[in-house]
């Protein structure tokens, strides 16, 4: 420790002080999981010193192997470490709560005024930007995950399976996990994770939860606590599901949304982009809660709001409730809002369960190849699945009338420019979407003047 680094830990943090920090974070957590984790690292490790870098990375590596939004889980994990279950619930909920209300408002504007020429023009430019963002996501995941020919082969097989044969996403995840498990036993060097997020390399001074701080009693694994959390978690899930079933029946959209997004929450290995193909298969093709175009627009809204990207499910729920007119044509906003709340509840409940129930168990298997090699296989498959999602988006953006219709040259140019900005010039996602939306609006305004 250098002379510029504090030798004493900061004073204990009250639950109220922590509450206001998590509340503020929920409004500024832009930039996807990478940006959100960077914000928390700067605030909690470097500035406030609530937790040491080593303990921060230790928690992050746990969250990375769980299904669900890792930044949300990291917030819940740190909140739980500091202030027990109450702290975890507060931290995790406030991380996505602002974006929930923002997306409900934006979804209402979209459904009520989406056909207004100015709004349609902005969306015309945003759609190819979203396609470029998904392609870039596949590139980023692939560059990190595909370290050898075996993993490249898994990614290619996953792409062919979903693109050519329309294999459901859960089967692809299951097959990739089995291949990863067997591969870890046969060729462990091909399925090693490479150390997750690495070891701590810097010391910012003594922290409240420091490297040598003992694990607090509430974070230690006991079978009694495990059983209590498990029973309560099942009750929270089954209680709401039973209420929906008793009130509306199994075939009602709200009940189906609860069941579908529970399954989706358990399949989000690799982040939100990984689960989007599954959500597309269910939301667009199977249940027809929204159209392909609406899903692209929803992803754009999700990219431009704070909170985890998986909050796009809130938009899907709102649009599904609105279009199905669940409570009649006079209550479209109410129907959309209730559906959005149902979807969000069932999407995020498993994340809290994994933290409160699974963190002590995951700690015992952290770094064990038998545990991590299936995740390596799944991550490789995710690359192929996300690339298929990009192809799906590109088809609907560039050939809106199908291959028999005209090719849209302007969206192609906008999409290429957006990808170049992301890849070559490291431009942020929000500026890219804003610029592409402005280009689409400008085109819409000048098109009538040009007589096109």
For the regions a language model picked out, list residue spans one by one.
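Multi-pass membrane proteins that catalyze or facilitate reactions on polyprenyl-/lipid-phosphate substrates
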Residues: 1-66, 77-305, 309-452
